[in-house]
Amino acid sequence: MLAIGEFMVKTLPLMEALKSLNLPGLERNLFSSPDWLTVLYKTYNCHLFVKYIEREGRIASYLIYCVVKNFLEWKICICSYCDYFDCYIERPDDWKLFFDALRKEYPQYRIAVRNLRDESARAFPEFKVLSQERFHFLDVRDPLEVVWKRTHDSFKSAVKQSQKIGVKVRKCEKKELRDFFQLHLDLRKNKYRLFPQPYRFFDYIWQQYMEKDRGGLLGAYDPDGRFIGGNIYLICGDTLYYKFNTSQLGSLKYRPNNLLFWEGIKFAKERNLNYLDLGSSGWNQEGLILFKNHTGAKSLDITHLGFTPPGYKFSQKRILKFMTRFFTTRWMPDFMLEWGSSIIYPYLA
């Protein structure tokens, strides 16, 4: 623990903190929830910690962070493998206490914060804006026909086209998770030249969510019954999270993504949920942003904030770039790419 000013900043490993502390607001969104953090811990062996401040016998403020120390960089990330991560901050001045504690404990580490709604983090003078992404969320509290009416005409047209062709969407069983993963691997390898997330990541998601009836994999099937796309939806609080999507290369004529999303809205309504979180989109992903806009969703900015200590040298990540290009060449067998992903992806925290 570290005494700074009037209050004590204390630290515990995350898994210990989840067992011994009453951390308020953990279920405020998916990324701060114990289920999601457990998936990250099991998949990537993340070094996750909690710093917290107590007042009047209760935890008043806390932040959850990942300590990253590898051949690529040294950093404190709030928080790795999350679209965004707003900390639980009671007073704006608490950011100063946490910042000073992190700087004292990790003087050579940069600090990275994925901020969506925490105004106190954006106002903290030590943090600089590094970049921004787009974030979308959809209010689905109105009757289904009203939600449908708010979608763009092009979205409606694509859904109707998909239905007319004969595409069917249904909730998948665990055995079909492999079909989803294969399309995910194909898309990342052949279209984007990126590592796929390792299969164990999706397997742990299934254990934490689908086996507890807190999510679902919706699969799209062409008229011949072939799996051509899928969406993974996760539930936290009153919100359904549109977490992962993939579709078969060359399946555009079937418009599976539009139908999958519409069925996701219906899934949210069936579970009496109020909102649909569409996640983040890079500003260069114009097609994805347009798709989300056409669902009737509203948008905000995810702001990447950071602090860099004097003399910090950013890695050029030449080894990572080489490995990525090498493993995603067209002649690379899929089992080799999957193996490479299981080794490399933990370094992408």
What are these regions (language model features)?
Residues 112, 170, 275-279:
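Short catalytic-loop micro-motif centered on adjacent basic/acidic residues
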Residues 67-69, 122-146, 273-349:
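Active-site/acyl-donor-binding loops of N-acyltransferases
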Residues 2-56, 62-73, 116-253:
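A conserved beta-strand-loop-helix scaffold within acyl/acetyltransferase catalytic domains
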Residues 82, 96-101, 204-316:
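Aromatic (often tryptophan-rich) hydrophobic motifs at membrane interfaces
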Residues 79-120:
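A gly/proline- and charged-residue-enriched helix-loop-helix capping module
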Residues 78-86, 130-137:
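Acyl/amide activation-and-transfer machinery of modular secondary-metabolite enzymes
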Residues 46-48, 106-110, 215, 271-273:
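Short, high-confidence coil segments that cap the C-terminus of an alpha-helix
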